[in-house]
């Protein structure tokens, strides 16, 4: 028998360090989900990716059970890790905070391609380049 989905909740949480405190508690508690069960399962599945923010898409069913899918970290997080910067710039056209090689952009595009609006690698690279430029990161060809 197919369970009926009552809602889908999207959360971006630190890998291996989720707690029942906000934002997890309020987001799942209002739907009657066992919060500790989610936290333990999420932390177990993201243990090897500590230090990253891993988005999770949680489907909550009528019987208060749930399933969740882990996504790849946001492109901005991957770009920050690749360049070693803490924060993006507030004025991307005027201020550069770092630089990244085209090869690193390609690697990030390969990681993110399944979650982007394209299946073409060259277009995925352009999307990641655009994100980098908007963060104040110059792309070295």
Swiss-Prot record:
Reported function: Forms part of the ribosomal stalk which helps the ribosome interact with GTP-bound translation factors.
Source species of the chain: Cyanidium caldarium
Annotated compartments: Plastid, Chloroplast
GO molecular function: large ribosomal subunit rRNA binding; structural constituent of ribosome
GO biological process, one term: translation
Designated gene of the protein: rpl11
Gene Ontology CC entries for this record: chloroplast; cytosolic large ribosomal subunit
NCBIfam families per the UniProt record, alphabetical: L11_bact
UniProt main location, coarse: plastid
Entry keyword set: Chloroplast, Plastid, Ribonucleoprotein, Ribosomal protein, RNA-binding, rRNA-binding
Record's protein name: Large ribosomal subunit protein uL11c
Superkingdom per UniProt: Eukaryota
Record note on quaternary structure: Part of the ribosomal stalk of the 50S ribosomal subunit. Interacts with L10 and the large rRNA to form the base of the stalk. L10 forms an elongated spine to which L12 dimers bind in a sequential fashion forming a multimeric L10(L12)X complex.
Xref: CDD domains: Ribosomal_L11
Record-stated family: Belongs to the universal ribosomal protein uL11 family.
